[in-house]
Amino acid sequence: MGLVEAFGHVSARLPEGGFMITATRPLPGARAAEVLQLSDEGEIISGEAELLPLETPLHVAIYAARPDVGALCRTHSPHAVAWGARSAVPPLVIGLDGLSGEIALHDDTDLVVEIAAGAAAASSMGDADCLLIRANGNICSGGLLSEAVVRAWFLEQRAANASRIGDAAPLEGEQLARRSRHYDVELVRAWRWCRAQFGDRDQL
C-alpha cells in the first residue's frame, strides 16, 4: 500500500481483553505466527519479546484512553509525514479523503517508548481518528481493523492531494456535513477496494 517501509505496526483489540500487535518485521512479509498477544498493560502473553515493537506503549495508551477504538495502524506514509513535520493538518480538498476522519497533532518528536509518552500522545489525539506525530509518522484508529486501515490509506491520500492542489478552498461546515453523511457506506466499499488491490481477492 506504500504506507510503511521498514517501520510500522498494526494492532487489534481482543474481545476477551488485551490486543494483538504485529512483530518488528517488514509488514509485506509478516507472518501470522509472529503476531504477539499482549495484555491491556502491554505485557507479552504469547510471542517473542525481541519482536515486540518499541512503540507498543503508544498502542497501550490509546486503547486505555479510547474504549471505542478497536484497532490501530502506525505508519510513516510520506505525504502525511511531511504535513506532520510542519505540525499542520492537511486540509480536506477532495470529498472522499474525508474517510481519513478527524486528524489531531502531537508535537513531541521522540519515539513513544514509555507509557507516559503514550499517554501524552493519547491526550493529543483526544477523540480524533488519526494523529499526526511531528517528524514521526502517524497513527490511525478504527472501531474495526478495516476502518483503521482505510483511515490510514485516506490520510495519506488527503495529505498528497492537499499538497498537489494547493490553495483550493477546503470542505468544511455545511459542505462537509452533507458530504460526510455518505462516509459509513463509502468506508465499507473502500475496504473492499483495499482488499482487492493489496489483499486476498477470494475473501472480498
Model-found features: residue ranges?
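An anion-binding catalytic pocket shared by soluble metabolic enzymes
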Residues: 1-73, 80-91
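Conserved active-site and cofactor/substrate-binding residues in soluble primary-metabolism enzymes
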Residues: 5-7, 30, 53, 57, ...
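Divalent metal-coordination and catalytic microenvironments
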Residues: 12, 62, 76, 121, ...
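Structural motif
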Residues: 18-20, 70-73, 80, 102-104, ...
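Short acidic/polar capping segments at secondary-structure boundaries
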Residues: 26-27, 77-80, 109-112, 127, ...
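Class I SAM-dependent methyltransferase SAM-binding "motif I" and its flanking Rossmann-like core
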Residues: 75-117
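A mid-sequence, solvent-exposed acidic-amphipathic segment
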Residues: 114-126
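A conserved C-terminal secondary-structure "cap"
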Residues: 127-204
